[in-house]
Amino acid sequence: MRAEKRKKKKKILYTIIALIGIFVLSTGSYAYYLWHKAASTVANIHENINKSKKRDSAVDIDNHDPFSVLLMGVDERDGDKGRADSLIYMTVNPKTKTTEMVSIPRDTYTEIIGKGKMDKINHSYAFGGVQMTVDTVENFLDVPVDYFIKVNMESFKDVVDTLGGITVNSTFAFNYDGYSFGKGEITLNGKEALAYTRMRKEDPNGDFGRQNRQRQVIEGIINKGANISSITKFGDMFKVIENNVKTNLTFDDMWDIQSGYKEARSKVIQHELKGDGTKINGIYYYKADESSLSDITAELKESLNK
């Protein structure tokens, strides 16, 4: 099933890049400082991965080639390497003016590439970091991963507090981790925002509902961040980004995407990976429906080849 959603706030890739792009595109008396600080920050968060074996040649952003990106929300804490609790695969095609995306449930049962075993897909990060996660997602969806952006979910609270709080629209009221969240428009501080993104067992949509709340928080951060006027807050944001974000996108890549791929925001298509929950040796897993997975793979490949 495909649900088409017009641009407005459903620009998941662009919200992540815009977290840095806000600084890149800033104007005013300190624009020169921000430009160089942004470039320095991107250089510090850069992390290479192997070129996809599913690509004959590398993607050319300058030529406006369609590309893919894997968004990884990692729940890392002190003394714990963490797991990839949010995996969103996206294709971006400026020629068809379309961005396509699929959220992969964290409990999805699949082969962990490089580990030689079947397990939950989010365990791939704990076993082998970014590279093993990328390899596993490529194998599961049978599509290339050109770029990745990894964000430590713990950093949400630091970002939100730096911005002075954010506003989200909760679809239902619930309690979690000592916090109460009402239905409708609510304002969150850092710790509240983190708790808001973590609850899933009481959500009628399970992990899909949790992923939606994560996107709400990201969008709230961008909306608030777009109005930053204090150079002190800019400095604090750069520090948070350096400590909590990794990507193989370069500063030039980000600039080219912001300027050359704008039309790909015209239409966002979100695919739903159907499946069922099951238990194997007493452990819960999400088993993707083979027909649904095959259809999504075909759609993603078509998006990358147009």
UniProtKB/Swiss-Prot annotation:
One of its GO terms (molecular function) is phosphotransferase activity, for other substituted phosphate groups. Keywords: Cell membrane, Cell wall biogenesis/degradation, Membrane, Signal-anchor, Transferase, Transmembrane, Transmembrane helix. It is an enzyme of class 2 (transferase). InterPro entries: LytR/CpsA/Psr_CW_biosynth (IPR050922), LytR_CpsA_psr (IPR004474), TagU (IPR023734). It is found in: Cell membrane. Residues 1-11 are cytoplasmic. Residues 33-306 are extracellular. One of its GO terms (cellular component) is plasma membrane. The chain crosses the membrane at residues 12-32. Its EC number is 2.7.8.-. GO terms for biological process: cell wall assembly. Belongs to the LytR/CpsA/Psr (LCP) family. PANTHER family: POLYISOPRENYL-TEICHOIC ACID--PEPTIDOGLYCAN TEICHOIC ACID TRANSFERASE TAGU. NCBIfam families: lytR_cpsA_psr, PRK09379.1. This is Polyisoprenyl-teichoic acid--peptidoglycan teichoic acid transferase TagU. It comes from Bacillus licheniformis (strain ATCC 14580 / DSM 13 / JCM 2505 / CCUG 7422 / NBRC 12200 / NCIMB 9375 / NCTC 10341 / NRRL NRS-1264 / Gibson 46). The lineage of its organism: Bacteria, Bacillati, Bacillota, Bacilli, Bacillales. The gene is tagU.
